[in-house]
Amino acid sequence: MSKVYDWFEERLEIQAIADDITSKYVPPHVNIFYCLGGITLTCFLVQVATGFAMTFYYRPTVTEAFSSVQYIMTEANFGWLIRSVHRWSASMMVLMMILHVFRVYLTGGFKKPRELTWVTGVVLAVLTASFGVTGYSLPWDQIGYWAVKIVTGVPEAIPVIGSPLVELLRGSASVGQSTLTRFYSLHTFVLPLLTAVFMLMHFPMIRKQGISGPL
């Protein structure tokens, strides 16, 4: 086993990478509130795992979406647990994101030279809220349907571009299969991809600039 490790160490310098990760200086003022971002990341990873598991059973059609969710909850092995964890971690992710944003703002973590870190963090907060909006509709029950109808109808108040924007969100003039397909695609592909991209921007900047000092 040691020979295998030595082979990789010689080529990749694994120990140097491990030392860099584990030996980063942590300021003495850091407390549990500085862990909120990490908790948010953990919730996101739980969301990815449980959401991926549910895609094996969920059917994104207006006629089968609700029944497929019912199947997950009552028939699929541990389906009730997976979906429950998905819902709980979704709520936890939103809460932790809000608290994280407040913590960063109140401790001045958005100031120079961390402006870009703040901007990417705000984008991640918007993406988190978007996860909630799109995911809420996927069971396609009464609550989900009317939530989608209200949310997608909000832009209609915008002059000139309001109606075309509503039709773009819904996929047609009214809420239906096109709307569910769009929201499912956003929730399972577009938003996770964008979140991963902005996380890959956010974390290296934190790593490079370190944790902001006390007020």
Curated annotation (Swiss-Prot):
Membrane-related topology note: Multi-pass membrane protein
Chief place where the protein resides: plastid
Annotated positions binding heme b 2: H86, H187
Source superkingdom: Eukaryota
Residues the entry annotates as binding heme c: C35
InterPro entries referenced in this protein's UniProt entry, alphabetically: Cyt_b/b6_N, Cyt_B6_PetB, Cytb/b6-like_sf, Cytochrome_b_N_euk/bac, Di-haem_cyt_TM
Keywords recorded for this protein, A-Z: Chloroplast, Electron transport, Heme, Iron, Membrane, Metal-binding, Photosynthesis, Plastid, Thylakoid, Transmembrane, Transmembrane helix, Transport
GO cellular component: chloroplast thylakoid membrane; membrane
GO annotation terms (biological process): photosynthesis; respiratory electron transport chain
Subcellular localization, as worded in the UniProt entry: Plastid, Chloroplast thylakoid membrane
Cofactor binding note of this UniProt entry: Binds 2 heme b groups non-covalently with two histidine residues as axial ligands. Binds one heme group covalently by a single cysteine link with no axial amino acid ligand. This heme was named heme ci.
Transmembrane parts of this sequence: 32-52, 90-110, 116-136, 186-206
GO MF terms, alphabetically ordered: electron transporter, transferring electrons within cytochrome b6/f complex of photosystem II activity; metal ion binding; oxidoreductase activity
Record: residues binding heme b 1: H100, H202
Cofactor (UniProt): heme b; heme c
Record note on quaternary structure: The 4 large subunits of the cytochrome b6-f complex are cytochrome b6, subunit IV (17 kDa polypeptide, PetD), cytochrome f and the Rieske protein, while the 4 small subunits are PetG, PetL, PetM and PetN. The complex functions as a dimer.
More details: Heme 1 (or BH or b566) is high-potential and absorbs at about 566 nm, and heme 2 (or BL or b562) is low-potential and absorbs at about 562 nm.
HAMAP family for the chain: Cytb6_f_cytb6
Family: Belongs to the cytochrome b family. PetB subfamily.
Free-text function comment from the UniProt entry: Component of the cytochrome b6-f complex, which mediates electron transfer between photosystem II (PSII) and photosystem I (PSI), cyclic electron flow around PSI, and state transitions.
Name of protein: Cytochrome b6
Source species of the chain: Sorghum bicolor
